[in-house]
């Protein structure tokens, strides 16, 4: 069921030719459980700055920390602990990890 939900979610956004970062600042525990977020891989990063290009769509749930992400040609967004985020395939961005980052993530 988790894969079906993710597939539907991504199909909807791919149909819209998603080019922006999508942030849910207050996802419900039900949504996180349905997506199986707790079983996703975990990535940690110390405060730093670096470019990041997405070859695949990434869904992520931030457990700790804060990052400022600036999409190429777009406005900077701040992503914090508790946020659920979708970074679209093809996104070119610059990241500034301002507080030690820990996130669950999944590529599709």
Regions found by a protein language model. Give the residues of each.
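Short histidine-centered beta-strand/loop micro-motifs
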Residues: 33-34, 50-55, 71, 77-78, ...
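Short, conserved beta-strand element in jelly-roll/cupin
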Residues: 54-69
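Short hydrophobic/aromatic-rich beta-strand segments that constitute the beta-sheet cores
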Residues: 52, 69, 103-105
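Conserved short histidine dyad/triad with adjacent acidic residue
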Residues: 26-28, 36-55, 88-89
């Amino acid at each position: 069921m988790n894969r079906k939900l993710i597939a539907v979610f991504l199909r909807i956004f791919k149909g819209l030719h998603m080019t922006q970062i999508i942030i849910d600042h207050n996802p419900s525990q039900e949504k996180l459980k349905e997506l199986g977020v707790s079983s996703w891989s975990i990535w940690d990063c110390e405060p730093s700055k670096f470019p990041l290009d997405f070859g695949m769509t990434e869904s992520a749930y931030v457990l700790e920390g804060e990052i400022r992400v600036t999409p190429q040609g777009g406005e900077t967004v701040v992503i914090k602990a508790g946020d659920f985020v979708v970074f679209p395939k093809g996104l070119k961005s610059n990241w500034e990890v301002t507080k030690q980052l820990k996130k669950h993530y999944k590529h599709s």
